[in-house]
Amino acid sequence: MPLSSARAAAFDILLRVERESSYASELLHADTYNRLSDQDHALTMELVMGVLRWRSRLDAEIAPASSQPLSKLDVEILIALRLALYQFRWLDRIPKRAALHESVELVKRARKRSAAPFVNAVLRKLSTAAPQSTPEPDSAEAIASTLAHPAWLVERWIHHYGLAAAAEICRHNQRIPPTTIRLRSPTAESELNAQGIKLKPGSLLASARRVLSGDITTTRAFRQADIVIQDEASQLVAILIGRAQGEVRILDCCAAPGGKTLAIADQNPTAEITAVEIHPHRARLLQNLVSGSKHNIGTVVADATNLPFTSPYHRILADVPCSGTGTLSRNPEIKWRLKPEDLSDLHTRQRAILRSALAQLSPDGRLVYSTCSLEKEENEDVVEEILAQDNSIHLLDCRSELDLLKNAGDLVWPVPASLTRGPYLRTIPGIQPCDGFFAAILEKDS
């Protein structure tokens, strides 16, 4: 029996995620795997994301069936075991014997032939064993165990958001996230409908649509950037920049892959926009996206902690690199990589970027500081530290800006204030139907 292309691809991707700290979502859309048939690509994605989402639950079940501690197993062996067990427990349509056989073959293919009998024995035990019972998620320990999250993260979320919200965040992270797009052309929606793409209106923004069925990546609208794949919270953060009057200069400090840059440009079509990205390969992705637009967007490869510009900007977006804990439904590997001490390192860099960006801001200018993190160290703590050190900067209450967006028809969420915590924008996955984002609006005195 030939080895399944989908399982081989899933194994390879999971191995790269472990060894190279790659992101599964990026690998799944690499040319190598895009050559798979639609059916095989869908199964590959299901296997990869399922194993990453439920990793700790899988390991907790594998451990008692293994004669060796999991920490002693080669990564290839552990990945093969996780792949098979995920299929046993979550993919009823796949016969257990097929999943077992293919994981044994994957180990042989990975040049671990001597481990094949061990893998076979462990999986035979697991294939006949009843699934482990899981506790109701009514405590930090139970949420972490049942919903497969690190306990330290769950404990933080309970502290900051409450037990019920923490459980909802974790439930949300374990679901397949929807594909959401931003419409950039007045004809894009009707064009997609004519091609059999089914859409429904977004929950937060008038420009957003959720894709119910169909492959938008094959459409002319996608190729021409008449639509952009972008979560609604990400869209909302970008338009907090506001519609500036007259000829203005706008800076996007950490711009790749470019969705927010385009949203800002669409809102400010006459602006001169500079999009900065530190990594050359990501800057190329950014350039490819914005090059087809009619906007005046220049891309610059530079470090946002030391911006090289001499003329000030009227509007700045500082969407800084962060832990990404608001996007775990899309990037589940993050929860297994992140360590508590990482938050301090991120805080230091984020503070440096915000300082550098504020130095570029003109008097009476506006800066939006944002992350896709749920962690206080990366959000309020960064902003409040800067405010305490610079009397020329003040905080604008996000609620007033959301009310303006609501009155203009851009925001369709019924209760704008529910998107805030104090003066800050805060979306919570599972509480709102979007990723978790934070934003603060800062203004410089004249």
Predicted regions and their residues:
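S-adenosylmethionine
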Residues: 1-446
